[in-house]
From Swiss-Prot:
Origin species: Mycolicibacterium paratuberculosis (strain ATCC BAA-968 / K-10) (Mycobacterium paratuberculosis)
Protein name: ATP synthase subunit b-delta
Major location category of this protein: membrane
CDD domains: ATP-synt_Fo_b
This protein's GO CC annotations: plasma membrane; proton-transporting ATP synthase complex
Length: 446
């Protein structure tokens, strides 16, 4: 009995412990589990609803996509049809354009080929004509005949006279031309009483004064002031040069500064002109004028064919002494004996270039030498040397054309083939066979 009661009490204690400590946690666990199951059921219901909604939305999207795809297909078909029509129209226009352009190209090529054929035929004709002319003028008699025919044509021009002025006069205005005439007359009066040595000294001193005036621009400007009273200018030149130059030179300088000059450089040109006239007067007294003229023109032609020499003689980076030294070396190495007057004239020209090309200055000097005798220079180029009769006839015809005695300076150029090329001052008469062939070729179509 006591055992039973003890067991009962133990059982009761166990039940109490279970109820007190085990049952509450189990209840809470069961409640939590129930709540979780209930939440899961709610979530499942919501998921089912969302599934239903997504199924409905998918169906609607599929229907919309089908409608959109049908619309896109319809639009694409319409665009394709329109593009096809446009391409067909453009293809037709392009075909017409290509056809028209092709026709124009054919016409252009035909025209070009025709022009090219004409050009080639023209050049061939000119070439053949040139060969015929060269074969024809290979005979000296026939070549001489071309000169005679040109002289016949030139003879017909004789009534048309041209006015050719003295070389230096063409560079000056009216006041300077009058001054140069007066100064030249004064120089002529003074020079006739001087011997050759005095004339040479006068020439040298005038060149020295011209060089000084070229350097001293202020002095030159004062000496050419166009004032009525020439006294101040005369007194200045006397103060500057009295005792440094000869009396004759000083007298000429007084006369020079007493004149009215249009430009400062005209006074220097006039002094250079008088220095040349002094040397040419010496040549005339020694009967060397023809030799001087010939050698001057020969040196001028040398400068034409030797441009490097002309450049060196006119190189202002080199002192004038160096350029004069080069000139003397060239003259000393010449195959002929150079006249001392020619050497002096060329030296003075190099010393007083004053910006002019050497070849132009020497050519001008040669023309001055000829003009002293009242002659006009005619530069004549021929394929062969002229006979004495042809040279005389040419001189006579040109003298009648220009109304002045003419000095013919002949230059041989075999490339001219026949006829003559004549240059007087700025006027050129070209009657060469080479120029006629060139003119015929120039008239060919491009």
């Amino acid at each position: 009995m006591s055992t039973f009661i003890g067991q009962l009490v133990g059982f009761a204690a166990i039940v109490f412990l279970v109820v007190r400590y085990v049952v509450p946690p189990v209840r809470r666990l069961m409640a939590a589990r129930q709540e979780a199951v209930r939440q899961q059921l709610q979530d499942a219901a919501a998921a089912a609803d969302r599934l239903t909604e997504s199924t409905t939305a998918h169906s609607k999207a599929v229907e919309a996509a089908k409608a959109e795809s049908k619309r896109v297909v319809d639009e694409a078909q319409a665009d394709a049809k329109r593009i096809t029509e446009q391409l067909a129209a453009q293809a037709g226009l392009e075909a017409e354009r290509i056809k028209s352009q092709g026709s124009r190209q054919v016409d252009l090529l035909r025209t070009q080929l025709t022009r090219q054929l004409r050009l080639e035929l023209g050049h061939e004709a000119v070439r053949q004509a040139g060969e015929l002319v060269r074969n024809y003028v290979a005979d000296p008699a026939q070549q001489s005949a071309t000169v005679d025919r040109f002289l016949d044509d030139l003879d017909a021009m004789a009534p048309a006279a041209a006015d050719v002025q003295y070389p230096l006069m063409t560079k000056m205005r009216s006041s300077s031309r009058v001054a140069l005439v007066n100064l030249t007359e004064r120089f002529t009066t003074v020079a006739k009483d001087l011997d050759n040595k005095a004339l040479s000294a006068l020439s040298s001193e005038l060149v020295s004064v011209a060089q000084m005036l070229d350097r001293e621009i202020v002095v030159t400007r004062y000496l050419t002031v166009p004032a009525e009273d020439a006294g101040p200018r005369v007194r200045l030149i006397e103060r500057l040069l009295s005792g440094k130059v000869g009396d004759v030179t000083l007298e000429v300088l007084r006369a020079a500064v007493s004149e009215r000059w249009s430009a400062n450089s005209d006074l220097i040109d006039a002094l250079e002109h008088l220095s040349r006239q002094a040397l040419l007067e010496v040549a005339e007294r020694e009967n060397k004028v023809d030799e001087v003229e010939e050698q001057l023109f020969r040196f001028s032609r040398i400068l034409d064919v030797q441009p490097r020499l002309a450049i060196l003689l006119g190189d202002y980076a080199v002192p004038v002494e160096g350029r004069v030294g080069l000139l003397r070396k060239v003259l000393d190495s010449a195959s002929i004996t150079v006249n001392p007057i020619v050497a002096a004239l060329l030296t003075q020209t190099v010393e007083l270039l004053r910006g002019r090309p050497a070849e132009e200055a020497v050519q001008f000097l040669a023309e001055v030498a000829v003009a002293r005798r009242g002659e006009v220079v005619a530069q004549v180029s021929a394929a062969a040397d002229l006979s004495d009769a042809q040279r005389s006839r040419l001189t006579e015809v040109l003298s009648r054309i220009y109304g002045h005695p003419v000095s013919v300076q002949l230059q041989i150029d075999t490339e001219l083939l026949g006829g003559l090329l004549i240059a007087v001052a700025d006027e050129v008469i070209d009657g060469t066979l080479a120029s006629r062939l060139a003119a015929a070729e120039a008239q060919l179509p491009d």
